Each structure stands twice: as C-alpha cells, then as structure tokens.
C-alpha cells in the first residue's frame, strides 16, 4: 500500500509517466562543424589486432562527433583540406594520439595502454576523445560520462514492481548492473564529486522509499538518512555539500536540506525549507553554485516550477514557469543558464527549456508521446531522458545544437530516471 501511495506521489509530478518514440526538437543552436581528418596508423607488428584497433578508431570518431561541434572522418577529401588532422598510432598495446594543424607536423597529445579488459579500453578511448574535443573546441567532450538509470520489467499478477539500477555508455555499450537488491530502485542522481563516481538513489528494499549512496565501484548501497517516514528525490550540491530531498516526516511531502560529505556522512540535522502551506513539493535541483534550488509545488492546484534562494539565507520562492501550468522534473544545466523540465502540453508530457537569461520558455519536443526525466551532459547542450508507453520505456539523447534525438538501444524492459554524469575531471 505504501509503495502505491508514493508511486502516486511521483505520478503527481510526472516522475513515473511512461511514454515515447521518435522525437523532434523545436529549438536549435547554430554551430559550424569543424572538419577533422582521423587516420589510424597500425604498427608493423599489430596485424593480429587490426580489426580490434579499427573498431576502437571508429569508437573514437563517434566520440568526437557526439558533441556536434566536430566533423571527424577517416576519409580525406582531395578538394578540402581539414584544419586539423589526428593520427592514432598503434604500437600494441600502446596507442598514441597526435594532432597537426594544417600542414604542420604532428605533435603527440595523449597516449594510453590497452589491456585485456574491453570495457576499460573503450573508456580510455572515450576519455582520450573528450580531451581532444576540449583542446580543439574549449567545450567539454561528453562521451566519457555514464548514464545511470532504473531498469524494470512488468510484474506478474499480484507481484510488486521491481527495478534495479544499471549504467550504460551513450551508445548503448558497456551495459552493467549496479544493484541487485530485488526491490524497486529509482531516481539515481550523480553527485559529481570524488574519483569513486558516487550517486544517490531511492530504494524500496525496506518497504518504504529511503535514500541510499551508491557508486560504480561499490554496488552495495549505503543508507544515508535515519529519518522517520519516506524520503525520495535526492539531489546534491558539491559546492555547498548539501543534500536536498523530499520527506513526509511531518505529514506533507516537504523540501529538506541536509549537510553531507562523502568522508563525514550526514552532518547535523536536516532542515525543512518549506512547510505544508506551500503545497506538496518535489523534484529539487540545485543551481551549479548551490545557492538556489528549482523545485515543483502544487501550491496553486497544479504542479509548477519555483526557484528558491537558499544561500546565504533562505528566501521566499518565486514562480518560474508562468506559461506552462503542469510542470515537473526540473534539471539545472551545468553552465547555470538553462533549466530543462517536463510539462503537459495539449495532453502530452513534453521536454521543455527555461532560459534564465531571457526568462522565456521553449518547448523542445513535439511528438504525441510522453517524455520524462531530462538530465544534462556536462556541455549543457545535450540531454538524456526516458520516453515510452505503458510497460515500455526507452532512453533517448537530445541535442540542442542539431535538433536531433537518438535512441539508446539497450534491450527489453522499462528504462527510466536517467542521470548523465560520472565525467572524469581531466578535460
């Protein structure tokens, strides 16, 4: 019964809507692509590894193209000389990446050593591509991050729904189970701190929703809070070392703040930011500097987005979205300039964007199938979200630059609550 009650609460804010397919984007950011020639130079003793090396080269080219700013190609045009060329030089298991501008000589930029671990090798290629992407564009590459999400299958009659957390690369590769709790695990949210790639999530393994700490290195989640009642929708500010979450400790689902660090854990007692006079609250998301929160409240009868200043002191929230009156799932962009969110438009839940510099709302998707849970890549120009119908849901990438969306092919099951993060701090 409790699980049904709180799944209903998620439904109020559009967290567990179930629906999407081919998608369109109605806002475009024009950026000229920079042509790049990529050449694989296989060492004289590497003939046996030729097929594998070519597959890694293809992955590298896809990684460079992912950010929609570079136009890499292994085919050199006689008519057009690209401004940059990259050579991948193999002396298996060593690989060196060299870069040349125009007709200048190649200079080594990066090197790595391959191992027997295929997954690890792919990650090394992703990280190399992102470093080169940043060097050429001064914009972070986005191929080295991981997408964590909840994967569940339809329960049999009378069974409670179960879902485990998984991680995957942007292209559907390196699919990996992160939890084995035989329960319902939802709403993972990257903390973006440290080298252990920690994330917060909610699990029902104790019967009611509680917040846990997990990581790619340790798949056994650790309970974070010892509060009565239900806690859900966690998000973290690494700048302020603050955990924001929703709890019904006082009866109403309210917004709370809790000081927290990986080394010390919970510090002090949680603070209730707003009380029941501000309606049912949900979906908090921090600004990059941790001074503000965007969240959802049904104070005026329908869920709408509000922003509240929490540092240096808590102030009165202000309404953010006046255009859309049934909104949920806000996600503040890493550059602090935009907030992605969901809103019901003509009966369909769409992905929308709020531009903080202009105060304007934009509808990003238009197809008649519900979309949910947008999460930003580190470049603030790409999103991942879930979309599908009842019993089915897939993950999609969305580019604000090209207007294009792309399905992440994973397999059967409902994929929901994606969170894009875990980017190495080396760009």
UniProtKB/Swiss-Prot annotation:
It holds the Pfam family PD40. InterPro entries: 6-blade_b-propeller_TolB-like, PD40. PANTHER family: PROTEIN TOLB (PTHR36842:SF1), PROTEIN TOLB HOMOLOG (PTHR36842). It comes from Chlamydia caviae (strain ATCC VR-813 / DSM 19441 / 03DC25 / GPIC). Keywords: Periplasm, Signal. GO terms for cellular component: periplasmic space. Belongs to the TolB family. It is found in: Periplasm. Residues 1-20 form the signal peptide. This is Protein TolB homolog.
